[in-house]
Amino acid sequence: MLVLEELDECLPGRNHVEEEVEGKLLTEAINRFLEGIPEHSRNVFVRRYWYLSPVKEIAQEYGMGQSHVKMLLMRTRQQLKQYLEKEGML
């Protein structure tokens, strides 16, 4: 990004700035995606990938089998990938 090159003299490492901007944009896109999916799917996804909860623990908390949790996570990841591709993030 040419605009970020203007910050080269006052910030350490331009790549760091670009990574920060890209990370922020990606975070915003993921948040939009999560807002658009069912609450149950969102909760399971956040527990697994934000709080790093084991599948077994998530299954117990939500009264689901571990295979059901794994399937739900796989489908949500697929939906997220499609969403990020549509948004031009991938």
Walk through the language-model features, giving the residues of each.
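Short helix-coil-helix linker/hinge
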Residues: 24, 34-42
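A short pre-motif secondary-structure segment
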Residues: 44-48
